[in-house]
């Protein structure tokens, strides 16, 4: 069973899908690292992806059983809570769209309490 993750400030929980396939990761934009893990970075932007203030970073280990997911600043160094600022509502909407797409591709699933 894969671990459960919560994005900083969100109340939803996610885990890896039991039907996760390697080709689905590659199709979704995950990049294989030198160590064999799979990284995914997506800028969360309103106008231009080149000046996005935040980005979604995900990592899945090479055994496809451990997930990390975090929203960071543009440099990728600081965790950011996009849910407590009302001006970032479009960013939250974009995040929801990305997570829904990853669920439809059977990469992640929402965990029900």
Predicted regions and their residues:
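Short, composition-biased local secondary-structure segments
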Residues: 1, 61-63, 69
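Terminal, regulation- and interaction-focused segments at domain boundaries
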Residues: 1-28, 110-113
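Intrinsically disordered, low-complexity regulatory regions enriched in serine/threonine/proline
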Residues: 9, 69-113
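Ser/Thr-rich, low-complexity intrinsically disordered terminal regions
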Residues: 19-64
């Amino acid at each position: 069973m894969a671990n459960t993750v919560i994005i900083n400030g969100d109340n939803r929980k996610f885990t890896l899908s039991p039907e996760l396939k390697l080709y689905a990761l590659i199709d979704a934009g995950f990049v294989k690292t030198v160590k064999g893990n799979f990284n995914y970075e997506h800028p969360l932007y309103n106008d231009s992806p080149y000046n996005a203030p935040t980005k979604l970073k995900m990592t899945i280990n090479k055994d496809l059983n451990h997930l990390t997911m975090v929203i960071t600043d543009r440099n990728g160094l600081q965790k950011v809570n996009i849910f407590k600022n009302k001006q970032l509502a479009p960013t939250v909407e974009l995040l929801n769209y990305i997570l829904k797409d990853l669920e439809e591709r059977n990469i992640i699933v929402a965990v029900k309490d």
